[in-house]
Amino acid sequence: ILVNEGFTVPVWHENGTIGKKKTRKELHVFSPGTNFNVHEKKEETNTIACYVVTKHDKGFMKKNPSIYFGCAAIDIFTGNTKLFQYSITSSNIHNHNVFDELERFNSIYNPSETIIIHNYDEEKKIDDIIQFAGLQTKSIHVISELIDSDQSRMVEKCEQQAYQKSILTDFYNDINDYDSFIESSNLSRNPIAYKSFCFLLDFIFQHNPNLTHKLNHPTFDNINNRLVLANHSLRQLNIVNPHNVKGQFSSIERMINKCVTPMGRRNFRDIILHPVNDIPYLKRQYKIVDYVVSNYEKFEFMRKKFKTIRDFEHLYRKIIFNKIS
């Protein structure tokens, strides 16, 4: 109940019996984005996100100020990991249009817990950013890089190449060649997103080390053929549910998502929320849809079979945690 209301709840385990010296050890820390409840799975995803927002003022060589965004999101139910980085240079970097891409990323992955790391010296501007980007999560942690704290020191650590290598190779033991991996995964070309990713991995590990086991390799949302969505398009067109309202007709995505397996519903949502402008690809998809609709009787038996398939991605995570039953 406390976690669902946005609280962070540490759980301590007590050893020893009456008459003997008792010891207590922190078992796990539960929070909205790190709560893996195997007994009560109401949603098909549970995502925690970290957003690094860094501004650079104008100077002798720069006529206008810039703002950089590094985004990382991890779904603890499936182990999927998504990253995104972008920057904007403008005379006015504090208006809602500047945060359109952050709002898009947040709307797509809809985290239940969010970490905001920033270098602003005005707290009011962070409140504005939360409003601009529509961050309506159960729990929001705000970390200033300008204020000395354990968390800000960890943020600084996540910028160091040696620490980045250490944390990545610790959590992904299938990486044989680190340099090749960060090149092929685009981490080396997106340092702000990499920094955000490292901090998020450590944050989750501190809550529950099991949640960082067997995560999928990070993939970037920076796709060249992706349709640009501005002015909060996904929310304004009601493609996604802007207020987390329940029900089939709470958004267009939920209304048209008729997939019968959890994996299918997640994949369908991912496709709908990542529209592309690649014409050959779209034509191929239209042909496939047209063929299936025209020959639906050939596929109807498959749909009935699919209804018996359980959530394999979630089951795999349960196996990792030794909670399968």
What would you call each of these model-derived segments?
Residues 320-325:
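C-terminal helical "lid" subdomain and adjoining coupling/linker elements of P-loop NTPases
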Residues 1-291, 304-307, 311-317:
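Charged catalytic and DNA/RNA-contacting regions of genome-maintenance
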Residues 296-299:
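Conserved interaction-surface patches within small, structured recognition/assembly domains
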